[in-house]
C-alpha cells in the first residue's frame, strides 16, 4: 500500500479532508463548502473559522471510516499552514497537531499555493522544471517550479486577483457567490463582442496582472446600461470573459519567454486554482500554450478549487523529500510566499 497520508485544508471557506497513498490512490475525500458566505457576496473570516471548528472533526471521522483505515495506518499528517485566513488556518493546524501528538505520526506544514502547483503531478507526467500559473480567489501569479519547495516568482497581480474580479463582477450583476461558475454559466449564452473592456498591461513587457481597471469598466457599463435584462447580463459576462482571456494570453506568452530564459527545456505550463476550472479559459490557455510550443496541463476541475487531495499530495511530495517532521513548533502563516518555502 505504500505511505498513506491524511490531508487537511482549512485556509479559506472550504473544510476539506483526504486520505491517499504515495501512488495517488485516493481512499477518501470530503469537502464541505460554506454556503453561508453567499449572503454576503464574499468570505466572512469569522464565519469561516467557526464552520471549520464545527465540522473538521466530523469530516476527518467520516474520511477515516470511509477509507477503512485507522490512525495507526497513517504515515504522516499534512495540513495547510498558510497562506490564508489566519483564523481558519489555526483551526486546521491545531487539529492536525492534536492528531500528530496523539498518534505520534510526523506532521507536514503545507504551503497552500504549493499544493495547488503540485496536485497536477499526482496523475500526470510532469517533471521539473515547469511553469505554473495560479489563478484563484486570493492569488494570481506565475511561478517557475525548480523542485519541491523551490520556486521563483516571475510575476503576479499588482492589485486584485482574477478570482476576486470574477466574484466582484458576479456581485455587481446579482449572480451570487462564488462568482466564477455563475459568470461562466451566463457567458455561455452571451456575446463576447457586445462590450469592449480595457486589457490592462496588454502586449506590454513583464508577467504582472492588473484587474482593478477591468472591474471598474464593468461597473461603469452596468450603470450606463441601466436596468439589465437577461440578455444584457449574459453579454456583460461573455465580454468580461473575452477580456480576461486576452489578458491571460498576453501574460502567458511573456511568462513562457521569461521562463525559457531562466531554464532550458520548459515544455509544461501547469494552470491551477479555482479559476482554472473555467472551461472557456482552459480552451484559450491551451491554444496559447500550444502556439508557444508548450503543453498546458490542468488538474481535474474538482481539484482546481480548494480540496484535501492537493494538500495530502503536497504532503506526499514533501514526505519523499524528507520534510515530514515530528516537531509541532510551526505556526500558521497568513502570508507565506512560495519563494520563501525553503
Swiss-Prot record:
EC class: transferase
Subcellular location: Cytoplasm
SUPFAM superfamilies: Actin-like ATPase domain
Lineage top rank: taxon: Bacteria
Keyword field: Acyltransferase, Cytoplasm, Iron, Metal-binding, Transferase, tRNA processing
A GO cellular-component term linked to this record: cytoplasm
The EC number(s) this enzyme carries: 2.3.1.234
Protein name in UniProt: tRNA N6-adenosine threonylcarbamoyltransferase
Organism: Anaplasma phagocytophilum (strain HZ)
Amino acid at each position: 500500500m505504500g505511505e498513506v497520508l491524511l490531508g487537511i485544508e482549512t485556509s479559506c471557506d472550504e473544510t476539506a479532508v483526504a486520505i491517499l497513498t504515495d501512488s495517488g490512490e485516493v481512499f477518501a475525500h470530503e469537502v464541505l463548502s460554506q454556503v453561508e458566505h453567499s449572503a454576503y457576496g464574499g468570505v466572512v473570516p469569522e464565519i469561516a473559522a467557526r464552520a471549520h471548528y464545527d465540522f473538521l472533526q466530523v469530516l476527518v471521522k467520516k474520511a477515516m471510516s470511509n477509507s477503512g483505515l485507522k490512525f495507526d495506518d497513517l504515515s504522516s499528517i499534512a495540513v495547510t499552514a498558510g497562506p490564508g485566513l489566519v483564523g481558519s488556518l489555526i483551526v486546521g493546524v491545531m487539529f492536525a497537531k492534536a492528531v500528530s501528538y496523539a498518534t505520534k505520526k510526523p506532521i507536514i506544514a503545507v504551503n497552500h499555493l504549493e499544493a495547488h502547483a503540485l496536485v497536477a503531478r499526482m496523475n500526470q507526467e510532469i517533471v521539473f522544471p515547469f511553469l505554473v500559473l495560479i489563478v484563484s480567489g486570493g492569488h494570481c501569479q506565475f511561478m517557475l517550479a525548480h523542485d519541491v519547495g523551490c520556486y521563483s516568482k516571475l510575476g503576479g497581480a499588482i492589485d486584485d486577483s482574477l478570482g476576486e474580479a470574477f466574484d466582484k463582477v458576479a456581485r455587481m450583476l446579482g449572480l451570487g457567490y462564488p462568482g466564477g461558475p455563475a459568470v461562466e454559466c451566463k457567458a455561455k449564452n452571451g456575446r463576447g463582442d457586445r462590450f469592449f473592456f480595457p486589457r490592462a498591461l496588454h502586449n506590454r513587457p513583464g508577467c504582472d496582472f492588473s484587474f482593478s481597471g477591468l472591474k471598474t469598466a464593468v461597473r461603469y457599463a452596468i450603470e450606463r446600461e441601466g436596468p439589465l435584462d437577461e440578455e444584457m447580463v449574459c453579454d456583460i459576462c461573455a465580454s468580461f470573459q473575452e477580456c480576461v482571456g486576452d489578458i491571460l494570453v498576453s501574460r502567458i506568452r511573456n511568462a513562457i519567454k521569461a521562463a525559457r530564459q531562466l531554464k532550458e527545456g520548459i515544455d509544461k505550463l501547469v494552470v491551477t486554482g479555482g479559476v482554472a476550472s473555467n472551461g472557456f479559459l482552459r480552451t484559450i490557455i491551451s491554444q496559447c500554450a500550444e502556439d508557444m510550443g508548450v503543453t498546458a496541463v490542468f488538474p481535474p476541475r474538482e481539484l482546481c478549487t480548494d480540496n484535501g487531495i492537493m494538500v495530502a499530495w503536497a504532503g506526499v511530495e514533501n514526505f519523499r523529500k524528507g520534510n515530514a517532521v515530528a516537531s509541532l513548533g510551526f505556526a500558521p502563516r497568513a502570508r507565506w510566499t512560495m519563494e520563501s518555502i525553503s
